[in-house]
Amino acid sequence: MALLCYNRGCGQRFDPETNSDDACTYHPGVPVFHDALKGWSCCKRRTTDFSDFLSIAGCTKGRHNSEKPPEPVKPEVKTTEKKELSELKPRFQEHIIQAPKPVEAIKRPSPDEPMTNLELKISASLKQALDKLKLSSGNEENKKEEDSDEIKVGTSCKNGGCSKTYQGPQSLEEVCVYHSGVPIFHEGMKYWSCCRRKTSDFNTFLAQEGCTTGKHTWTKKDAGKKVVPCRHDWHQTGGEVTISVYAKNSLPELSQVVANSTLLNVHIVFEGEKEFHQNVKLWGVIDVKRSYVTMTATKIEITMRKAEPMQWASLELPAAKNQEKQKEDTAE
């Protein structure tokens, strides 16, 4: 009568009369499962497939074994009728402490709230720079030069995206390749509104060739103030969000930063003739009264106090999320 061999990795039937010392090929070790790898403790082969694991040939020769291994012994739980049901409950339940209720998030205010001018703090370095350049005193002599029709050699073209300079009368006949739109910075991408070639790299953005042709604009009288992009970034702490705009020699009397709880509008005039504009729909809610602007000779820092101490996922509210908020406001 053929008997079943219970050696690990064998599982064959054998005749007890012909059983010999090398009749069985099996694994004397135990199964090992670690980090998705499967194998036997007695040999080095490992596999991630369970079917391959079952087909791993034994590593040891011996006699077939017909004795069924004993089943694992289950721990015996002794109870008595005298003990109450409460005494049989796990002890750890006695030490459970109810977690505090989560703090409810502040409801997002309406974007139509009145805008408020943030306090401007002017550093000593900016005051010294403006005094030196005589930009804050409204010098009449400079104004006359600005109003003059004379174009100096080396004057830069005022059209956006054009880097040409005036070299003489021949420059008046040159074709200007420029951007007719305005620079847009949104969710890490930079592009011009007129051609929308988006990039995340600031230097690549500055090097983008214009999409419109026309005549150079050499004087401010014709061009007005020149809207230009500025490198800017942001960081946050537990209670504040800070935006840094890298614009040199900004003019406090011509610049303003206005905000409400969820919107920020930045208008900065710097280096006499340049302007920077940025409108931001903030990801979180700010405390306008405790927010302020610090103007230095090299940059402007906008420090916004968070209405609640939480981590912002980004500076700007994503467009999709903003549309959902508008739908909710309309429904209400």
Swiss-Prot record:
PROSITE patterns: CHORD, CS. The modification N-acetylalanine is found at residue 2. Keywords: Acetylation, Chaperone, Metal-binding, Phosphoprotein, Repeat, Stress response, Zinc. Residues 5-64, 157-216 form the CHORD domain. Zn(2+) 2 binds at residues 27, 42-43, 59. Residues 227-316 form the CS domain. Zn(2+) 3 binds at residues 157, 162, 176, 216. The modification Phosphoserine is found at residue 51. The keyword Acetylation applies. Residues 65-316 are annotated as: Interaction with HSP90AA1 and HSP90AB1. Residues 2-77 are annotated as: Interaction with PPP5C. Zn(2+) 1 binds at residues 5, 10, 24, 64. The modification Phosphothreonine is found at residue 47. Zn(2+) 4 binds at residues 179, 194-195, 211. InterPro entries: CHORD_dom, CHRD1, CS_dom, HSP20-like_chaperone. Residues 64-82 have a biased composition (Basic and acidic residues). GO terms for molecular function: zinc ion binding. Pfam families: CHORD, CS. Residues 61-82 are annotated as: Disordered. GO terms for biological process: centrosome duplication. Interacts with HSP90AA1, HSP90AB1, PPP5C, ROCK1 and ROCK2. Regulates centrosome duplication, probably by inhibiting the kinase activity of ROCK2. Proposed to act as co-chaperone for HSP90. May play a role in the regulation of NOD1 via a HSP90 chaperone complex. In vitro, has intrinsic chaperone activity. This function may be achieved by inhibiting association of ROCK2 with NPM1. Plays a role in ensuring the localization of the tyrosine kinase receptor EGFR to the plasma membrane, and thus ensures the subsequent regulation of EGFR activity and EGF-induced actin cytoskeleton remodeling. Involved in stress response. Prevents tumorigenesis. This is Cysteine and histidine-rich domain-containing protein 1. It comes from Sus scrofa.
